[in-house]
C-alpha cells in the first residue's frame, strides 16, 4: 500500500478543531512563488498549480520513466499547501477584500528521499513530455518551528473567525504570533474545492508563534 503522509503524520495533517501549539520539523517541498488573486481564472496561481502538480506526479511516477531514485517507495502525493502574505500587512493579518495584493508560495511536500537533483530531472522531464516550462518550480526547505494550528471547516473567506480563536488561545498560552519574511501564515488544503461543498472544506491553518 502506498505511503500516505496524511494518515502517517496525523499530528500535522489532521489537527483538532480547537487551536493547539505544535512544533513542526523542517520539511522539503516543491514550491512555486507568485503574487495575485488565487481565485483569478487562469491567473498566476492556477497556472502555478499546473506546474507544481506536473513535477509532483512526474516524481511519483519516476520508476515508470526508468528513473532510479535511491530509497524510493510508493507514496500518495501529499496535499497542496500554501504560505500567504499580504502587502502592507507585516503583522500577518489579511484584508480579504484585497486578494490582488497577496503574495504566496504554493507547495507540495516531498518524501525525504527526493533530492534537488531529482527535482531538476522531473522539471526537465515535464518540459520534454508536455512542453510545459516548470523552471520556476524549486526544491524548498521550510523550517517552521513552534506554531499554533487548527482544523478550519468551511469557506476560505470565513477563516478570520477561526484565526480570531487562535489569537485568543495564544494569549491564554502566553504566546504571540511571530510573522516575518521566513515565518509565514501557512495553510494545508485537504479538500478539493471543485468537488466538496464550501461549508465542508477542510483546511489546516498554521500561524508561527513565539513565547513571551
Go through each PLM region and give its residues.
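A solvent-exposed interaction/effector surface
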Residues: 1-212
Amino acid at each position: 500500500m502506498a505511503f500516505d503522509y496524511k494518515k502517517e503524520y496525523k499530528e500535522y495533517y489532521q489537527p483538532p478543531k480547537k487551536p493547539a501549539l505544535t512544533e513542526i520539523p523542517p520539511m522539503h517541498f516543491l514550491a512555486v512563488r507568485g503574487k495575485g488573486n488565487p481565485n483569478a481564472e487562469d491567473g498566476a496561481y492556477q497556472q502555478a498549480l499546473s506546474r507544481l502538480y506536473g513535477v509532483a506526479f512526474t516524481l511519483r511516477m519516476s520508476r515508470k520513466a526508468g528513473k532510479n531514485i535511491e530509497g524510493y517507495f510508493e507514496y500518495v502525493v501529499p496535499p497542496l499547501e500554501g504560505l500567504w502574505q499580504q502587502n502592507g500587512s507585516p503583522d500577518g493579518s489579511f484584508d480579504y477584500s484585497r486578494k490582488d495584493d497577496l503574495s504566496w508560495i504554493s507547495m507540495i511536500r516531498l518524501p525525504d528521499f527526493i533530492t534537488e537533483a531529482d527535482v531538476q530531472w522531473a522539471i526537465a522531464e515535464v518540459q520534454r513530455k508536455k512542453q510545459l516550462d516548470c523552471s520556476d518550480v524549486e526544491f524548498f526547505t521550510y523550517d517552521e518551528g513552534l506554531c499554533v494550528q487548527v482544523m478550519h471547516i468551511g469557506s476560505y473567506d470565513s477563516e478570520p473567525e477561526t484565526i480570531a480563536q487562535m489569537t485568543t488561545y495564544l494569549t491564554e498560552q502566553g504566546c504571540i504570533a511571530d510573522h516575518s519574511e521566513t515565518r509565514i501564515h501557512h495553510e494545508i488544503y485537504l479538500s478539493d474545492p471543485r468537488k466538496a461543498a464550501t461549508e465542508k472544506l477542510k483546511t489546516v491553518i498554521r500561524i508561527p508563534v513565539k513565547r513571551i
